[in-house]
Amino acid sequence: APGEDITTWDLSRILSEIDKQFQKTLSYHEVLKKQAIGDYDFLLNKGNVPESYRPTLYDFLVHNALLFYSAGEQAGSKAQDSFVLSAESQVFASAKDFMAWEIDSEDDESPKIRAIKLYQDLLNFHKNGENKDAFIEADLLRLRYGYNQSFGEEKNARYKAALKRFTQKWPDHEMSARAMYRHADVLRGEGELL
């Protein structure tokens, strides 16, 4: 087994350690959900994402974890990720159905399953909030995640239908413009004239 000298670690060990740290940190989710992100401005480089999209320390950490679990490097980090995300699954369902989805898999360490569960928890956390920005953005991001990670003949059709449903549900929200762009991008990829 590799020692504690990080300079001797291989990719698998590095990714495993990052995963452990995210799991440990996110195990304090109840505390993190109560910590306003603004209280940590002096520590964080938040970029250009409005605070309403990442209102708590939990949001900040979950979105970073989602970037990690969605990264292509994950594919080579484990002997196998037995979970295959089907386009026919609930990944493109309504937010309500997606949140209720119970994944039938024994592979609890799958990066895909970890990402799906984080999206479910994030959506559940924000579903009843006064400000819907964090919920709406997380919902659009999970649809994009589904498009990037799923397989199946109906992938494009299900993604386009989900984006259409999204824009109909949130017609006046700025994220609808992003959803329309994603829809147009899929059409362009299919050779449709726009």
Where are these regions (language model features)?
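Extracytoplasmic/secretory-pathway proteins
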Residues: 1-194
